[in-house]
């Protein structure tokens, strides 16, 4: 019984907290999404360039040893 009351109280508090959350409007949501997508794209390009550079440097070092 006590355990069920604690669960009920927990979910009641969760419900109360959702009313306090700042929910973005459609314009803010789209702007934030575009920023995240752009940041991921830029970071992916940086990782691609670094990976390609390291690969080429390693290939160069391995061919020098032959």
Swiss-Prot record:
InterPro entries: SecE_bac, SecE_sf, Translocase_SecE/Sec61-g. Keywords: Cell inner membrane, Cell membrane, Membrane, Protein transport, Translocation, Transmembrane, Transmembrane helix, Transport. The chain crosses the membrane at residues 29-49. Its main location: membrane. Pfam families: SecE. GO terms for cellular component: plasma membrane. One of its GO terms (molecular function) is protein transmembrane transporter activity. It is a single-pass membrane protein. GO terms for biological process: intracellular protein transmembrane transport; protein secretion; protein targeting; protein transport by the Sec complex. It is found in: Cell inner membrane. Belongs to the SecE/SEC61-gamma family. Essential subunit of the Sec protein translocation channel SecYEG. Clamps together the 2 halves of SecY. May contact the channel plug during translocation. Component of the Sec protein translocase complex. Heterotrimer consisting of SecY, SecE and SecG subunits. The heterotrimers can form oligomers, although 1 heterotrimer is thought to be able to translocate proteins. Interacts with the ribosome. Interacts with SecDF, and other proteins may be involved. Interacts with SecA. This is Protein translocase subunit SecE. It comes from Rickettsia typhi (strain ATCC VR-144 / Wilmington).
